[in-house]
Each structure stands twice: as structure tokens, then as C-alpha cells.
């Protein structure tokens, strides 16, 4: 129940934020290539991931075009994994980099793909309020040059990159 309440508060917060300027996204996303396991390399701190390491997101494309979302992370405080399930969708096919994600109906938040590697090896994801930002990778580590480039793009897009924290990926994962 506490987790649902936390997700509800988070989604309401995300919805209540308004962008001070437009946030450009990638022009093309092939969801069949985007689906799968992503490791969180870094993020802007947020309440729903506080104290979590080894954070992953798994996206599974459904036949109706929606995407199942499974976020997992290891709670360093509780000593166990936490997970949250949701659904994502692309509201406007002309803007495939702008998704809506819902973990608790009827609330949803923005999930904007700001940068995406041509080979779908890494991505920069944020929202127009500039309060949420993630660097994702298909592997647990990301080349330093790529990381720096993504951080520079985030900074130029108006994100407070000085607050970004790296996400540890050194946990024991019994399921992987």
C-alpha cells in the first residue's frame, strides 16, 4: 500500500510540473528494438528511487502497441529488491520519443527519449519539467566518453547535471 501511495504522489508531482521550454526528443524510435533490459547508469535524485542501487528497467512491447514496464532496484536500507510495474504508450505517433508511463491509473508521467544510440546501446531519458533524468545502457557500464556526451546534452537541455548521481550496478542478482 505504501508503494502505491508513493507511486501516486510521484505521478501527481510529475503531472503538476509544467515545462518552461520545449524539450526536443528523438525523431525515431523502433519500439521492438527499444524493448528489453536497460541498466540505469545515472539519474537525478527522486523520491521513488531513494536508496536504490542496481536499478533496471525492462520494457516489453505488447501486441496492442503498449509497453509493459518493470522497474527493479535493490534497496540498500531493506536489503532486498523492490519492483514497480507499469504501462507505457506513445500518445502521438508523430512524436515517438514522447511516451506516457503510468504505474497507477489514471495518473501518468512523461517519459521523453532525448538521445538514443543508433544501435540502441544507450539512451538519455527525461521529462519536460527537467526534474527527472536517467542515463540508461544495455550494459552495466557505459564508456566515459559516451557518458560525458549524454551529460553535456542534458545540461544543454536545461537539466541540473550537478545533481546527477551514478547508480551502482554491483549487486548480487539471483534472477540474472
Question: How would you name each of these model-derived features?
Answer:
Residues 4-14:
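Sec-dependent N-terminal signal peptides
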Residues 17-176:
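A beta-rich soluble binding module of mature secreted/lumenal proteins
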Amino acid at each position: 500500500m505504501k508503494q502505491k501511495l508513493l507511486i501516486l504522489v510521484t505521478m501527481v508531482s510529475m503531472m503538476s510540473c509544467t515545462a518552461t521550454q520545449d524539450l526536443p526528443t528523438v525523431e525515431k524510435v523502433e519500439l521492438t528494438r527499444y524493448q528489453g533490459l536497460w541498466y540505469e547508469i545515472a539519474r537525478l535524485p527522486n523520491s521513488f528511487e531513494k536508496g536504490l542501487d542496481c536499478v533496471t528497467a525492462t520494457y516489453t512491447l505488447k501486441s496492442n502497441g503498449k509497453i509493459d514496464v518493470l522497474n527493479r532496484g535493490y534497496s540498500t536500507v531493506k536489503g532486498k529488491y523492490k519492483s514497480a510495474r507499469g504501462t507505457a504508450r506513445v500518445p502521438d505517433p508523430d512524436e515517438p520519443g514522447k511516451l506516457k508511463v503510468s504505474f497507477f491509473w489514471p495518473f501518468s508521467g512523461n517519459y521523453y527519449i532525448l538521445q538514443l544510440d543508433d544501435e540502441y546501446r544507450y539512451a538519455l531519458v527525461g521529462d519536460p519539467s527537467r526534474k527527472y533524468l536517467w542515463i540508461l545502457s544495455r550494459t552495466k557500464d557505459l564508456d566515459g566518453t559516451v557518458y560525458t556526451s549524454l551529460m553535456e546534452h542534458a545540461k544543454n537541455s536545461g537539466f541540473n547535471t550537478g545533481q546527477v548521481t551514478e547508480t551502482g550496478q554491483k549487486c548480487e542478482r539471483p534472477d540474472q
